[in-house]
Amino acid sequence: MKLPIYLDYSATTPVDPRVAEKMMNYLTRDGIFGNPASRSHRFGWQAEEAVDIARNQIADLVGADPREIVFTSGATESDNLAIKGAANFYQKKGKHIITSKTEHKAVLDTCRQLEREGFEVTYLAPQSNGLIDLNDLEAAVRDDTILISIMHVNNEIGVVQDIAAIGEMCRSRGIVFHVDATQSVGKLPIDLTKLKVDLMSFSAHKIYGPMGIGALYVRRKPRIRIEAQQHGGGHERGMRSGTLPVHQIVGMGEAYRIAKQEMESESQRLRGLRLRLWQGIKDIEEVFLNGDLEHGAPHILNVSFNYVEGESLMMSLKDLAVSSGSACTSASLEPSYVLRALGMNDELAHSSIRFSLGRFTTEEEIDYAIELIHKSIGRLRELSPLWEMFRQGVDLNSIEWSHH
């Protein structure tokens, strides 16, 4: 077993060696290096064929038509293109958008930008387990609502939203429905022939593909229109201009192919490992599970350790690569906005750690992590005056703290 142990698979994943090997054939003179838009010679044709194969591999995993897959630079761009693209195209019908407070920053910040441009956005608060109440969603819909954006799996707590039910509601009311599936694709089954989802964002680097490549699913029947956000050459059927990075696209395709093949067995394995981790730490005093194990994605476990500061816990767990919150926001010392939206107080939100498991996580690593967490929590609480006061039965909320 090598230290440190990587338990931050929701931030990014290592590229699978099978993916890296395939990508290497699309970079140098010895391989296929042409521009897929070069239609006049073999170099371009071979590159175009490689892109077509990858497009099919991605479509196969999610039950889409390959013509519905638009390549982007990643899920952040896909979210931007979906939300701004649909809002701009359908704004004559209305200017109201609905999303949730626990979305990824790529969705929230895009909605904030649209507010500056004159759109109105309703941000729904989830229930304490992280799930959106469908009655709340229905109640928020107005005559001028044109777009609803709800993520499939939350990147911090792993809760799985009922996108099938939300999709039915949107379709019956003629509202465009966007889903950010970055954390669910390749881990949970997605079948877009059955789901009433109009736009769906994907990434490669969360399922053992390369960084810097993603895709947006844009439904053809009933046809959904979006306005391009990037111009210059009309690539990707006019929705996203720019030379296609063949090696990255091939990597994404191969990663999605492997995910389809291994998803069922791997999801079961990860569920088992996550349960082993939770069983190993749940008896520590004042430990709380954030999210919902029943409705949770198989790879994420978010836990709060009361009376322990999250940053100091991460320092003392230096042999475990874990995060507090998501990578996009964990550089700040603000408590997680996702946990705050679940109604959690700052102290508990500050003491939360996200463990995310993946393809290369072993039982041995989980057992080592359990032992290390027990030791670290014990040591940090010995140093904590708050813990001592709590043990003595002092109600910490009743104390008047003096501010310096």
UniProtKB/Swiss-Prot annotation:
Cofactor(s) the protein requires to work: pyridoxal 5'-phosphate
Pathway noted in the entry: Cofactor biosynthesis; iron-sulfur cluster biosynthesis
Binding residues for [2Fe-2S] cluster: C328
Pfam families: Aminotran_5
Keyword Transferase: yes
Enzyme class: transferase
Its EC number(s): 2.8.1.7
Residues the record lists as binding pyridoxal 5'-phosphate: A75, T76, N155, Q183, S203, A204, H205, T243
Compartments it resides in: Cytoplasm
Keywords noted in UniProt: 2Fe-2S, Cytoplasm, Iron, Iron-sulfur, Metal-binding, Pyridoxal phosphate, Transferase
InterPro entries named among the record's database cross-references: Aminotrans_V_dom, Aminotrans_V_PyrdxlP_BS, Cys_deSase_IscS, Cysteine_dSase, PyrdxlP-dep_Trfase, PyrdxlP-dep_Trfase_major, PyrdxlP-dep_Trfase_small
Modified residues annotated as N6-(pyridoxal phosphate)lysine in this record: K206
Lineage: superkingdom: Bacteria
Any GO MF annotation of the entry: pyridoxal phosphate binding
Any GO CC annotation of this UniProt entry: L-cysteine desulfurase complex
Major site of localization recorded for this protein: cytoplasm
Function summary: Master enzyme that delivers sulfur to a number of partners involved in Fe-S cluster assembly, tRNA modification or cofactor biosynthesis. Catalyzes the removal of elemental sulfur atoms from cysteine to produce alanine. Functions as a sulfur delivery protein for Fe-S cluster synthesis onto IscU, an Fe-S scaffold assembly protein, as well as other S acceptor proteins.
Known partners and oligomeric status: Homodimer. Forms a heterotetramer with IscU, interacts with other sulfur acceptors.
Protein family: Belongs to the class-V pyridoxal-phosphate-dependent aminotransferase family. NifS/IscS subfamily.
Protein name: Cysteine desulfurase IscS
Species name: Photorhabdus laumondii subsp. laumondii (strain DSM 15139 / CIP 105565 / TT01) (Photorhabdus luminescens subsp. laumondii)
Phylogenetic classification of the source organism: Bacteria, Pseudomonadati, Pseudomonadota, Gammaproteobacteria, Enterobacterales
Name of the gene: iscS
